[in-house]
Amino acid sequence: METKQALEKADIIFSDNAAKKVSTLIEEEKNENLHLRVYITGGGCSGFSYGFNFDETYKEGDSSVENNGVQLVVDPMSYQYLIGATVDYLEDLQGARFIIHNPNAKTTCGCGSSFSV
């Protein structure tokens, strides 16, 4: 049985820019069942790495936040490292990408894709 918990707005912030980009990508895929899953794995030069993928399912214990009609979903293990973080979408000279501003990260690598706590 699937259970999903709605996050308080302050738990993890899903920025308007990120939500709009996710909405655009879902429209391009023509699959309204998709949501953005954010997760943390071991690895990277600082110990932990962020990951993003599109998913159609919710897993036991997932938490989610909605913005612009789309869902951001986080598993229970990743959630503990993302409390207070902002998931954003940025387009600049380095390219276009989803990024996480994480107040729990003590150090980050130069590219910003890994961190330590």
From Swiss-Prot:
Instruction: Answer yes or no on keyword ATP-binding.
Output: no
Q: How does it assemble?
A: Homodimer.
- Keyword Endoplasmic reticulum assigned to the entry: answer is no
Q: Report the function annotation for this chain.
A: Required for insertion of 4Fe-4S clusters for at least IspG.
HAMAP family assigned to the protein according to its UniProt record, in alphabetical order: Fe_S_insert_ErpA
As given in the record, the signal peptide range reads none
Q: Name one GO biological process term.
A: iron-sulfur cluster assembly
Q: Name one GO molecular function term.
A: 4 iron, 4 sulfur cluster binding
User: Which terms are listed as keywords in the entry?
Assistant: Iron, Iron-sulfur, Metal-binding
Cofactors (names)? iron-sulfur cluster
User: Which species is this record about?
Assistant: Ruthia magnifica subsp. Calyptogena magnifica
- Protein's UniProt name: Iron-sulfur cluster insertion protein ErpA
Which InterPro entries does the annotation name?
A: FeS_biogenesis, FeS_cluster_insertion, FeS_cluster_insertion_CS, FeS_cluster_insertion_RrpA, HesB-like_dom_sf
Family recorded in the similarity comment: Belongs to the HesB/IscA family.
Residues noted as binding iron-sulfur cluster in the record, renumbered to the chain: C45, C109, C111
Describe cofactor binding as the record notes it: Binds 1 iron-sulfur cluster per subunit.
